[in-house]
Amino acid sequence: TTKEIALVLKNGPNDGPVNLNCGSDFVQKNQRAPETPSTRLSFVNQRCASVDGDCDRLVYFSIEEGEEEGKEGENSSKKQNFMLCDGDKLSILIAFFLIEQLFLAGLAHKISLGIAHTAYSNGAFTKFCEKNGVETVCAKTGVKNVHKAAEEHFDIGVYFESNGHGTALFSDEAVKVIEKELVDELTRMSVEQHLRKEEEKHIQSVILTTKLKALLTLKATIQTINPAIGDAISSVLLIEGILRKKGNMPFQEWHAMYRDLPTKQTKVKVRDRTVIECFDSERKCLKPEGLQQRIDEILLLDSCVKNNNRRAFVRPSGTEDIVRVYVEASDAETCEKISTKVEEAVIEFCN
């Protein structure tokens, strides 16, 4: 029926060790489709969900096939464009959908909604949120930190780390407001239908039905999403439901909501990672003294004016003596240059 969601399992039980050449982490970090025996099928123009071995992370991807490459008369193949919707785009889709439903339900002024993220969220994501009036809060790396931020700052807090680990949280108060409004709306509809004339009743019921549908959608979302930290299966059901509610929104349209800036992540081996102290949700470095100033200077290299698309930060690993370096810029070449210089600065200041 039209209410069913058809999910086709692409991998099989004999595909080898869990997460080997597959899973959300493989897809996100390598920017390519899974490569297990059972998945050597065409992903072209298909909307695909990829979860990790213990089903707490989720990313979506698709492959768009373009024009054929190669000269006439030679062996040619069609150019393939890999498209990824990571945790940032999961957050965007869910948050924008819920904002729309709150507006239609007349609850936008009663229930606050926002997105919690980490410093690893792409700069294009945060600018897109700002441009569209979506409130965000940045938390320290780690899903427990983002979960806490979403819970503390918003009545409805949406969060997904870039790797697809996350969920949406509805506060007890938000649930009560939605449920009360739903009961009140059903009561009003019942009364209006008995009191109004047939023509007036028809007009009024159209208005009420729009609100009622939004309230029922919010109620269904609460029942679908798992507020525990990471349940990829319930997240798949929510995403599929949203895409369907949005008129079977094409994957390409979702993916094109904004274009990610090129990024690079590296690790630098150091003698003692604890010499680095960070603040501003790990986006700035407090110690060792002078390192943050050097990073700021590097970001301005080869640029007459400050480039707002350039960003870099360093943070110590939580488990080993390495420093993690994150760099973001308008193009991959600039990313490489900045990353190399930041790595050199880390070695200079931390060894």
Residue spans for each PLM region:
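Catalytic-core signal marking the mid-to-C-terminal active-site face
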Residues: 198-221, 242-351
